[in-house]
Amino acid sequence: LPSVTEYYRAHTPVREVGPGDIDWDHLFGELRTRWFSTGGIYTSLSDKTANLAVEGMKKAGQYGAGRSFDLNYRSNVEPDKNRARDINREIVPHVEFLVGNQDDFDDALGYETEKVPKDASFEVWLDIYTKMLRQVANDYPNLKYIGTQLRGALSADRINWSAVLYDVESDVV
């Protein structure tokens, strides 16, 4: 049986929460929240959620809180890749730790990379991904770390899966 994932978010209440609705000064100032994280599914729910995420990232940065973002592109939530890219290109300049897989970096930010054969060695994956990670870091100098998953489904039962973390400052993957 084929796998089907349903992302029904059209009437979820959180899509109505927008800029000005959250007391960021209370969260990051008084409560001393140390980390703010969100992702592509949330920011694609509505213009309000996208703008709220940008507002939160900026405010977290003002208070010195860590900021992470999972690109997490889902065409079932936002079928328009250009809209998703526009949103993400506004958010990523305020992020320190960015996460996504190869397809996310393409679909959600517009980085086209060489496709890796599913049965490729880890070294081949790493070489191709390292080029992409360095390009993303060059385009977004605010980033400190970029995480990505290396995944090749050989069959329903066999998947090559690993992950890497790119430390931008030391240029180590």
What are these regions (language model features)?
Residues E16-W24, N51-E55, K81-I87, D127-K131:
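Active-site glycine-rich loop that binds ribose-phosphate moieties when present
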Residues A10, I41, N72-N76, D103, ...:
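Active-site beta-loop-alpha junctions enriched in small/polar residues
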